[in-house]
């Protein structure tokens, strides 16, 4: 049976593309170049990356809107289901014994729009290594849940986890996505350092967001255009057992279904 929503979207999409071709007088050689480029994106397995880089921010803004809840942000292509549930107090994201990077302590809370703690929430946390790679998505890293974990709030809604502070990194630039950005559009392919967050709780809309750090050189030129000012966090330094740690704090607010 035909899907009326698909028909509506497909017809308008193809009409827009045809109008674009006419308005810009796209020639047959240009059309063939575009077609070959699209084929190369598929052959490189970069369609998730390409779509995230150019369109996911817009989809995110349409899907979640703004209100008195925490702003959403793109999920990106590096999420992995099944991260371990961290039961330590405080929780510590899995890492190698000699994991390089500045130690980071994250504190915060999960509440609803009236300020009530959401104790049944599950917070998926993941971020890059100190050299900008993600476990399961880099041949340089073992296929295990490195710098990935799930955290649950305490009875008062508070959360705390320890990790390393992520760093800015370039999205893959050797493939067609990076080549388009760098060689043809004249843009860089850097993303500011960020922590990925996905929070689920019964009765609430899932929250997918990213948290950034004040002073990052790529906040104003993120290659994915995903930065929102309300998601940029100040960073303080504290001493824990004689070692300097980076301290960040953020309170999440979820919206009811």
Curated annotation (Swiss-Prot):
GO MF, any single term: catechol 1,2-dioxygenase activity
Keyword check for Manganese: no
Residues that bind Fe cation: 134, 169, 194, 196
Reaction catalysis annotation: 4-chlorocatechol + O2 = 3-chloro-cis,cis-muconate + 2 H(+); 3,5-dichlorocatechol + O2 = (2E,4E)-2,4-dichloromuconate + 2 H(+)
Enzyme Commission no: 1.13.11.-
One GO term (biological process): catabolic process
Coiled coil segments of this chain: none
Cofactor: binding comment: Binds 1 Fe(3+) ion per subunit.
InterPro entries in UniProt: Catechol_dOase_N, Chlorcchol_dOase, Intradiol_dOase_C, Intradiol_dOase_core, Intradiol_RC_Dioxygenase
A Pfam entry, by short name: Dioxygenase_N
Cofactor(s) required, per the database record: Fe(3+)
Keywords for the protein's UniProt record, in alphabetical order: Aromatic hydrocarbons catabolism, Dioxygenase, Iron, Metal-binding, Oxidoreductase
Family: Belongs to the intradiol ring-cleavage dioxygenase family.
Name by which UniProt lists this protein: Chlorocatechol 1,2-dioxygenase
Record organism: Rhodococcus opacus
């Amino acid at each position: 049976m035909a899907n009326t929503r698909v028909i509506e979207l497909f017809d308008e999409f193809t009409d827009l593309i045809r109008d674009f071709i006419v308005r810009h007088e796209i020639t047959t050689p240009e059309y063939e170049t575009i077609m070959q480029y699209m084929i190369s994106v598929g052959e490189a397995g970069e369609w998730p990356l390409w779509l995230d880089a150019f369109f996911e921010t817009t989809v995110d803004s349409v899907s979640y809107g703004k209100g008195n809840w925490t702003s959403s942000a793109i999920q990106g292509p590096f999420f992995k289901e099944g991260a371990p549930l961290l039961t330590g107090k405080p929780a510590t994201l899995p890492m190698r014994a000699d994991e390089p990077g500045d130690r980071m302590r994250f504190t915060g809370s999960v509440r609803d729009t009236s300020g009530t703690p959401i104790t049944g929430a599950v917070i998926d946390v993941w971020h890059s290594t100190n050299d900008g790679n993600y476990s399961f998505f880099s041949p340089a890293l073992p296929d295990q849940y490195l710098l990935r974990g799930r955290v649950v709030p305490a009875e008062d809604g508070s959360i705390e986890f320890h990790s390393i502070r992520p760093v800015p990194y370039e999205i893959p630039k050797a493939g067609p996505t990076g080549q388009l950005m760098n060689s043809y559009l004249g843009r860089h392919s850097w993303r500011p350092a960020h922590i990925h967050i996905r929070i689920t709780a019964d009765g609430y809309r899932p929250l997918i967001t990213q948290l950034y750090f004040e002073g990052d050189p790529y906040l104003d030129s993120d290659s994915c255009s995903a930065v929102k000012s309300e998601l940029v966090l100040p960073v303080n330094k504290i001493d824990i057992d004689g070692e300097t740690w980076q301290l960040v704090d953020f309170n999440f607010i979820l919206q009811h279904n």
